[in-house]
Amino acid sequence: ELDASLIIFDDELSPSQGNNIEKMVGKRVVDRAELILDIFALRARTSEARMQVELAQLEYMLPRLTRMWTHLERYKAGIGMRGPGETQLETDRRLVNHRIKLLKERLRDVERSREVQRQSRQHEFKASLVGYTNAGKSSILRALSNAPEVHVEDRLFATLDPLTREADVGDARVLLTDTVGFIRKLPHHLVASFRATLEEVNEADLLLHVIDASHEHWEEHKFVVDTVLEELGANEQPVLLVFNKIDQLDEEGLHALHE
């Protein structure tokens, strides 16, 4: 009726569900996980972030390769033979598996380097900014560390790499780290690929949980972040709630927040 060329589902579909729906509607189908992965791919700026996103995309794609071949003509093979499409599909599976293995090896090397950096900072007081995507973590990092080079944008997933800057809080020196923002129903492939990055929060002496107080669903966002922190084993870390963007609230909103 709407003559749409693309249908997006706000949930993750299994390979068979995606395949069956595409056959039924005759349109390209994208689920929530694939859409978020595509957004991450657009935002990735460093080599580490690109590798992490590519790994998540490939692991998402692997069980769905057959569906991605449905637009090609298939030939039925005789006994003991395969059609050209099927042969190419098997080749693609091998290539994808090889690439996944290579990316995991490279990311392990990156993690070893990151561990060396952590060891060099073990005697410093470390705080990590965590929160729902676009809550304003990078803006707070820029303000507290007086670092104008910190990238700030009003959009989802503007930060994919942990970024650490020094901040002076009173007479104390703090290493403040910005982290990737969380979101409802974050694809499990992304959590796995970014685990080394996300686990920066486990090394923190204090978590600054940044909340966009102007968002009507901030309580749901807080619950999502708390859940992901628990999955990462960081739910026992000391947490300080930072309500951001309160200047956008009216008196009624401020009163509700105080309550």
Predicted features, each with a name:
Residues 68-206:
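Conserved G1/Walker A P-loop phosphate-binding module
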Residues 1, 5-28, 170-172, 194-259:
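Conserved C-terminal guanine-recognition region of P-loop GTPase G domains, centered on the G4
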Residues 63, 67, 101, 185-188, ...:
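Residues in soluble alpha-helical coiled-coils and helical-bundle/repeat scaffolds
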Residues 1-127:
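Conserved P-loop NTPase architecture
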Residues 38, 136, 248-249:
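Flexible, glycine-rich phosphate/dinucleotide-binding loops
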Residues 32-39, 96, 188-194, 253-259:
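Short alpha-helical interface patches
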